[in-house]
């Protein structure tokens, strides 16, 4: 990141990020992110816009996964695609209420059949990891931590872009292998 920012020249930065870095991210082998990023395109076409965004992000301490996740959530709230295809983002206070009523634990499997940006799954993950589990003590066991990262949360959406956004949202909140799949949850399940 720092080396790209230090390049200074907007054209060089854009060429490197759109050509090499994005290509690398799309090809991360052995991870679910590779599947989610298949067919993704780099959406910042202007070198000047990329430089502006990178300069602004560089001023923020993104080493904290919580801060990075919060920033990502803020950017999600500004999505212009909200309402397209009948999709609407659930307000965070509604997510918080639903999660508090549910009180998820590490014994649960949480499935969101229309996950959109994965706001509900992230809320449930944060609850299980922290506030709802005695301030994170249960999260510290190896078994709980592994279950949290690999099999506790599942989301489905019928919009490929939302699947990518949801997977990245989960990743930004510490779920290294997000179980987010492209699927219309109203259709019958395929035969096994």
Residue ranges of model-derived segments:
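Conserved S-adenosyl-L-methionine
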Residues: 84-192
């Amino acid at each position: 990141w720092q080396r790209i920012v230090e390049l200074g020249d907007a054209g060089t930065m854009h060429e490197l990020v759109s050509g090499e870095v994005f290509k690398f991210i799309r090809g991360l082998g052995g991870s679910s992110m590779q599947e989610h990023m298949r067919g993704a395109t780099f959406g910042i076409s202007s070198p000047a816009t990329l430089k502006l965004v990178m300069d602004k992000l560089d001023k923020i301490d993104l080493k904290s996964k919580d801060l990075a996740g919060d920033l990502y959530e803020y950017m999600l709230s500004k999505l212009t695609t909200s309402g397209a295809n009948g999709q609407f983002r659930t307000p965070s206070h509604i997510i918080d209420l639903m999660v508090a009523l549910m009180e998820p634990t590490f014994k649960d499997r949480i499935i969101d059949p229309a996950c959109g940006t994965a706001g509900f799954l992230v809320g449930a993950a944060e609850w299980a990891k922290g506030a709802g589990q005695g301030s994170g003590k249960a999260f510290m066991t190896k078994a709980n931590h592994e279950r949290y990262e690999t099999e506790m949360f599942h989301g489905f959406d019928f919009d490929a872009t939302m699947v990518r956004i949801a997977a990245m949202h989960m990743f930004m909140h510490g779920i290294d292998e997000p179980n987010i799949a492209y699927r219309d949850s109203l259709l019958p399940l395929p035969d096994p």
